[in-house]
Curated annotation (Swiss-Prot):
The gene is LOGL5. The keyword Nucleus does not apply. It comes from the Eukaryota. This is Probable cytokinin riboside 5'-monophosphate phosphoribohydrolase LOGL5. It comes from Oryza sativa subsp. japonica (Rice). One of its GO terms (molecular function) is cytokinin riboside 5'-monophosphate phosphoribohydrolase activity. GO terms for cellular component: cytosol; nucleus. Residues 1-28 are annotated as: Disordered.
Length: 246
């Protein structure tokens, strides 16, 4: 009887049953193929910033989204790129030749795209991405963020722009933009270009649901223009059409 009982219990611990319990977690479907992440080359003083960078990278991998970033392995840039690369995701680092030395930014993981200038770097990152996310960062992060917001306002692209507002880091910026709306310098539709959330998961969900706001009737309708012929045109990624959008 004891032998029969042991045989009856054996299937529960069989390798086949154990393997069935260890099914791989399915990736969450996403409408984005690649997301561009702007963030600091410093880790920041709060551990929460670093945790958020890693969590964002993990969320991108879980959703099967490639990472596009400015290259390097330092600060938050390094954390998010390592999280994606280490999780089996694809990383595209866009690095300007001779502008940012390797000693300063460190090694770039994954696929390296070499460009000739900082202007080309921003244009290439934007062209390759389906959405933009800004983690906490400094002047460079703000410049990149505000530029893609402006491009959306000018109808160069209709891609969602997200702020990962970790511990309220971007509260002051959002308050400033709200004041600009109140004072008549930013239109209410243009304010809706920016999507913000405190966690990577919440932000990506919001970006997935993003619908571009209606544009002002007087806004210029511009087209994206990428020039690789000469440095003279490297910074010109758009050109105005003669007609106004009405």
């Amino acid at each position: 009887m004891m032998m029969e009982n042991s045989r009856e219990q054996q299937p529960e611990s069989s390798p086949a049953n154990n393997n069935s319990k260890k099914k791989k977690k399915k990736k969450t479907a996403s409408r984005f193929r690649r997301v561009c992440v702007f963030c600091g080359s410093s880790p920041g003083k709060k551990a929460s910033y670093q945790v958020a960078a890693v969590q964002l990278g993990q969320q991108l991998v879980e959703r099967g989204i490639d990472l596009v970033y400015g290259g390097g392995s330092v600060g938050l840039m390094g954390l998010v790129s390592r999280a994606v690369h280490g999780g089996g995701g694809h990383v595209v680092g866009v690095v300007p030749n001779g502008v940012l030395p390797r000693e300063l930014i460190g090694e770039t993981l994954g696929e390296v795209r070499a460009v000739g200038s900082m202007h080309q770097r921003k244009a290439e990152m934007a062209r390759e991405s389906d959405a933009f996310i800004a983690l906490p960062g400094g002047y460079g992060t703000l410049e990149e963020l505000l530029e893609v917001i402006t491009w959306a306002q000018l109808r160069i692209h209709h891609k969602p722009v997200g702020l990962l507002n970790v511990d309220g880091y971007y509260d002051s910026l959002l308050a400033f933009i709200d004041k600009a709306v109140h004072e008549g310098f930013v239109s209410p539709p243009a304010r809706r270009i920016i999507v913000a959330a405190p966690t990577a998961s919440d932000l990506l969900c919001k970006l997935e649901e993003y619908v571009p706001p209606p544009h002002d009737a007087t806004a210029l309708k511009l087209t994206w223009e990428m020039s690789t012929v000469s440095e003279q045109h490297a910074g010109s990624i758009y050109s105005p059409k003669p007609d106004m959008a009405r």
